[in-house]
């Protein structure tokens, strides 16, 4: 069974044997592991000036970063961030990964048309707009949705639809204390386009993983009712209890994540190891679980801590 097939079984909440699947939204520490700048950190201001040979070499080097990290750490999925982010380069990057690894890995890309928490520069203006111009927000999200689903449909026509398995929707909605969008506003402004894009992707044959950090509990019902195949992060720093979420929603949705990034960053080795084991213990029963951090392997994280997490997964994250 390929790693791709194992990820898909987890998304479908089906029984699997061997290791619980694992992957990370992003593994930024490629310089430390491979001696290469992560693809998302590269700047190609003169891309259009480059020769076809130079472009191909750059794309192959990016593909190597993605696939080598997956091989080294046993990841079953690769979240591909095309750079430059256009259709032509996305297709070529995905093709290189498929050419070099076959159908071994579940490949996904970003594809979320909904609004995230605004940054500090936009916070006040956007907050006012929620109340003063909700129809404008809805219209803008619909325009983004059309653009993203057109991209997905176009991609599905390439290589018999074999390049991409799904989309990961990465708009963040929540702070650690509460959602940015109150539940009623979330239900009116955000949930409808979220449900619509998930259905559109599913109708095309794509899987969906919905990511958001923070305290999702006040909007959990909305998220589940939008029917993504999986929910990612399950942020313990936002008070999300994986065991309780599993008990209540584990028959409806695959759960991904929950290893506390805060403890990986600042906790003791003993605290971090205990939390890693807790996530495995709470998430694995009943299947429908993909093991990962509660965010990603971000710039500044101690690689030794992720290596410890991966070692515990290899030794203990196994279905009997």
Language model features with spans:
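Active-site loop segments of alpha/beta catalytic cores
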Residues: 1-65, 76-320
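Short, solvent-exposed loop/beta-turn-alpha elements that line the ligand-binding surface or hinge
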Residues: 70
